[in-house]
Design a protein with these regions (language model features):
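Sensory modules in modular signal-transduction proteins
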Residues: 2-31
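Residue-level recognition of short loop/turn positions
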Residues: 29, 68, 99, 115-116
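PAS/LOV sensory domain surfaces, especially short acidic/polar patches at coil-to-helix junctions
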Residues: 29, 33, 37-41, 47
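Beta-strand residues that line the small-molecule/cofactor-binding core
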Residues: 74, 102-104, 120
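PAS/PAC sensory module
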Residues: 90-94, 104-107, 122
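Hydrophobic beta-strand positions
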Residues: 25, 64, 95, 111-112
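Sensory coupling linkers of modular signal transduction proteins
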Residues: 2, 111-135
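Terminal output helix/cap of sensory domains in signal transduction proteins
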Residues: 11, 50-97
Length: 135
């Protein structure tokens, strides 16, 4: 039987479903809980195809990747550190986009904190070119 999701995650998912900017929702343990249609278009797979993924699964498949094209482990990602400290984070990353091509992105991470403490994070991202400008 599935445990009830925190209300703040349910509301965050509803918000992400209604915005045109690529975004995903990460749960308290780093699992990929949801990503919207715009994110699915960028990575080449709809959320309905992947479903919920563990932190290890989604970082291996989608990234972020380092300069040698190796996945950055979830716990070594600076955005993860910030969220665990209930701080927002913004940075540039490389992900695996549609067709297996790597794409540079800018990403902003916002922690979600409810009555019971941290529930996860919202990550909003967009493609950027080599100069860091939106692509």
């Amino acid at each position: 039987m599935n445990a009830q999701k925190p209300l703040e995650l349910i509301l965050a998912r509803n918000l992400l479903s209604s915005i045109p900017t690529p975004a995903f929702l990460v749960g308290e343990k780093g699992e990929l809980v949801f990503y919207n249609e715009a994110a699915g278009a960028l990575v080449g797979r709809r959320f309905e195809e992947t479903g919920k993924l563990s932190a290890e699964e989604w970082t291996t498949e989608f990234g972020p990747f380092d300069e040698n094209e190796q996945p950055i482990p979830y716990l070594q990602n600076p955005a993860t550190t910030a969220v665990r400290e209930n701080r927002p984070y913004h940075g540039n990353f490389r992900i695996c986009a549609a067709g297996g091509n790597h794409q540079d992105i800018a990403a902003s991470t916002i922690p979600i904190v409810g009555p019971g403490g941290s529930s996860g994070a919202i990550v909003i991202f967009w493609a950027v070119n080599e100069g860091g400008k939106p692509a």
